[in-house]
């Protein structure tokens, strides 16, 4: 659903839209080091590393399945052709994904020193961490040096109509954009104006770390 119109798209399309948002944010911020929290199979990280080979990328994933799949893919010599189709633009180095620092770990206890990354981001990951959301955000604020970028279904954009009924009925993610400053993350930009699911909206939020 976007701009008042219903659109028919696959999960493939949703991944590409969210990936394009990440690409544009990295182009804007020009970070030298990036961490994804809750990286799953590592698709976003893998494509970003190949597009921006000069950036040091790292990812943390809690599940055995996600971490194992990401590491198995990383052991290949080159990026598989079927993954290249996810990329919305050219890849500068199809082998750069082999340098990603993938780690299995908990977002509520990140295995990195304070201020280790210029940018920390999450994509539909905080929504799965409601019980540890506060600790995860505190850890994100601790390890980022400059910014946090989240594409998450914050309550702020799910407070009306079907979205409100959906999240309240499932007792889903309670976090709000307005909560971020309590962790030292001050929102600079927020938008839900991009194609996405009808019943659960995500919002792309950029926040700056301030002490």
Locations of the language-model features?
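A short, conserved alpha-helix within the catalytic core of class I
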Residues: 128-139
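Conserved alpha-helix/loop element of class I SAM-dependent methyltransferases that forms part
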Residues: 13-30
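Conserved glycine-rich SAM-binding loop
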Residues: 40
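Conserved beta-strand signature within the Rossmann-like core of class I S-adenosyl-L-methionine
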Residues: 145-156
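Short alpha-helix
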Residues: 167-187
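A conserved beta-strand element that flanks and buttresses the S-adenosyl-L-methionine
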Residues: 121
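Class I SAM-dependent methyltransferase Rossmann-like catalytic core
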Residues: 1-17
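Class I SAM-dependent methyltransferase SAM/SAH-binding core
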Residues: 43, 47, 51, 55-101, ...
